[in-house]
Structure formats: C-alpha cells, structure tokens
Amino acid sequence: GDPYVLMLERLALPSLGSSGSAAEHLGDIDPRSFPALDVDIESLSIGDKNYGRVGFDLRTDLFGAHFLALRGQVLGIDLGDASRQNALHWWYQENGRRGSQLKGKFAVRDMGKVLSSLGYERSLETRSGGFDVNVSWPGSPDQWAMSASQGRVKFALKNGRFLKTSDAASGALRVLGIF
C-alpha cells in the first residue's frame, strides 16, 4: 500500500546518554519490520543539540530497511533533496548479522561550522565543498565507527583556509588526512 506520511514541525528526543543502552536496543531490531514512511522533520533535536532539518522515504524489503531520498540539512551538511539518490541502508542477514551503508553526494558551505557542530575545534573554514560517499560498517546505523568502516569518501573543499588552532584541533585535521 501507500506509505504513511509523517510531517513534523519539531521532534525532540532525549539524549542517548553514555550508557549505550539505546544502541544495544537498536541492534536488536529487525529493520525489515519497519512500515513504509515518508518522513519530513523541520527541526530535529536530541538532548540539547539541534541537528537541523531532515527527511527521508523509508522502505523495506527482504534485505533490510532503506532510508531513501535523504534530504534536509543536518549539522551544516546539506543532504540534498528528494531528487538525489542519497540513501542510508540498514541490511539484515538471516544469520542475524546486520550492516549499514551510507551512499550519496552531500554538500557543505563552511566546513569549520560542520567541524564545530561535530565537537571538533574550528580548524578550517570554506565557502563550499562536497562529499561523495559510499561507506559501509557492521551493525545498525547508530553503530558507525571510522575504524570499522570500509568504502570510499571523496571530498573537495573550495575557497577555504586553515586556521591557527590549539594542538587539540589536530585530531580533526588528521580525520581529513585519512581520506
């Protein structure tokens, strides 16, 4: 049948906390059981942090859940609009193993603001940039870890400069250096 349509002006979720219990519960979910949904949230916050505007079309099949047509702007990253092929896949295998994949082209204006929103020191600033991503990792989407990821990330940042920062900011620059 037709997907349910969910349009929210605001969605405020509690902080996940440091216990990790919420992540353990997500790992127990069979992503194939989700209903078909077209979701648009104007303002998403988790705990005290506002993530921005997000939307997706959720579909499931025998292989898992597929968050298609990612759209909106989250933490300064432009997810695109419904016409793009940006997607997050949550795979399910019969042996109970799960995996996730993020695939698409995403844009940023000021990479410094993105770094800051992710908890890093603002070590560079840009006027524009883009990322072409095809990355997968074991587990549910919230279990992403760079060390467990495989795939490719291509990026181009334009009209920018590195800023003088503390030694702590070198961690963010090392992240860029990995790619």
Located regions from the model:
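Small-residue helix/turn framework positions
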Residues: P3-L16, P31-N50, G55-F179
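Long, charged amphipathic helices and adjacent flexible linkers at domain junctions
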Residues: G17-P31
